[in-house]
Amino acid sequence: MVACSLLALCGLKMPPANSQELNRRTTSQSAPEVNLDQVGNISLTLIHQADRLLADQQWDEAIEVVRGVVRTDGKRLIAVNAGKAKTEGPYYLTVQQYAQGWFASLGQRAPEALVRYRRQVDPLARRWFIEARKTGDRTLLQRIVDELFASSYGDDALLLLGEYGLEEGDYTAARFCWEQIFSQPRGGLAPDHQHAVHGRPFWMQLRLLNSNEAWAAVMPALQAAPAGRPWLTCPNSDLERAAIFARLVLVSVMERHEQRARRELEYLGRLYPGEQGRLAGRTGSYVKILEDLLARSANWKQVAASTDWSTFAGTVSRSATPARSIDIRHVPVWFQSLQHWTAEQELMSLVRPRIAEDMQGLLSCFPVIHRQVVYVNEQTRIRAFQLQDGSPAWNPADATGTIFDSGIARDQLLLEGKHFGVVRGTLTVHRNRLFAKVGSPVSVLSQRADPLVHPTGYLVGLDLDAEGKLLPGFPLRPDGPDWAFEGAPVIDGNQLYVGMRRRDQVRSHAYLACFELDSGKLRWRVLICSAETPGQGQWPEITHHLLTLDHGMLYYNTNAGAIAAVRAADGDIRWLTTYPRRTFRAGAAEGAGRHFFRDLNPCLIHRGILVVAPSDSQQVFALEAATGALLWQEQSGKTDDIVHLLGVVGDDLVASGDYLYWLDLYKGHLRRQFPDAVDNDLAAARPDPRGLGRGLIAGGEVYWPTRETIYVFRREVARDAAAWQLHRQIDLLPRGVSGGHLLICNDRLLLVTANRLFAFRND
């Protein structure tokens, strides 16, 4: 998909206005530099030259200059708000995407130039489109969108791609394709956009219209093309507007997003009340078809979700919310001992108390559950137990349940002296195959370390149908001592995706890589960003940055000043958003904010909204997943202890650390905090109760573990208002356990402490 903004050359549009606030609040400390693979000065000069040629009506010459820049630098990045203050947080697209915006803008800037451009590219676009429609080749359709967006066939390709996305249940992709056909679905509520919230989805702006008078005031703006066209849309599309917007409403209905569907349906009824056509297998009034479909959707059965817990946070979208609630009344039905890890030499832990865990007992293990078997990665080995009784999964003679042994003793992995980061053990199961990073947890060696004697970390892939036999091509090892895998990969089809780090003498480089599962062969590897990290080459670093996968798009929180969306099929960066970083200062509490304890913090995605809590920023913020545009940031200043993004219930984002928080998913407002806040000063008392471990959302309830109790919150509705109330408490001490990570599968609740794995019967 082509990413967001229409980019008029060099007079590049500002990113969403609220991104200025995001950066203003985070510039009180020095901001370490983030380096990207940006386009060079020669290409930037050529882009300026193309604009001047266009102004002089030298159409063909201007077009050829831009096409030439794409040929030489199409994969490199360009800031869409070039020339603005650095504190405003640049937003980046590839040069190829930028060029599509330039060509699309010709429809308004120089219509004759658009005619000439289409004479050049339409024959190829037509050939690709006819072949794609005949064979169902979506790759060709995507090439039209990527490379020939402003051709006469760009809108037709988007229409068909959206249909394919709808068929597959990829509602985010379908919506974004159709929104690019016309500008109105991305417009604002005023002709000049001054009163619109740039980047915020249109339906969220429609929520402001609560009366006929309010609608009447904005109807002229809604009926006209938005001034300035802040979003990339097809120039001069001849497709029927009502039909396209009816499809957008259909997506909301199919997604069961009732609030958005009702707002968009009202918009459709007011702007196109009498339009008719074929939709959802019926012919007639678009409005009547959708009204009937929306009414019937209330009785649709929910799709049964998998009961497995296949990776960190349950799913690769990092937002699992099991349907079954929890009620344990007994002592554990079984337990197993776990490898014990501490943070006694971890530099951040020496400055300030850890968040939601203890220095002497790290909650390092994050098990997965697959086909009634529990798998645990202890870094030196992987173990498997039967969910029902805790017995070894395959070899009864081995009471430890070990299914893979790295051959590296725990003592060999212990770091001598101080270091950054702590050990985390994650796994991913996909189609009865298990993947994990084992061996050394260190991702960046100190400059003093001897790489020839230090053990390395590597990826294993185990065939669970063959009792843990290594898959062909595994283990996967990094290219050398300067390279490291970040953590457990995510899997899609025959492709394995994983974050990688490379260290030189100056900075650390964050990459995304794709390997073929059947051979272990590297398919592609793309540089995301380069930046200084806390160790600065003086201390070893342990990092564990996980990817988020949603319908063919990878989202990567680098914790190094950049968030990126990368297309899984080919490794193309679709957008990259930066934010000002904070510098960790060892030995100084004021330079060691609680947010630095965020380590297992992948992006959480829910219905097209990407929530991010980077470790090098005190902010929690949300981006639109399709475009990277900033939707909101949490501004209370109270949430820098958030280390776990637990999921979404209704329109509430639930997150936790030492406290438990509820935030408005669409605005970022802090709705509730439990318990009440205490002074955040280092010398102040910690909250009571205090979070201990990662909770979960199940059956619409929030389960928050503390040392002695699991607190259960339920959303109570009264007088058209909803509020989260403490519903009950599950006492842990009488059961002989303390708090820790929670996960659930069928009739078992697992609780993971620093040194034991407990299983309870979920009654």
Feature-to-residue mapping (PLM):
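Short solvent-exposed coil/turn linkers within tandem alpha-helical repeat scaffolds
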Residues: 33, 37, 71-98, 108-116, ...
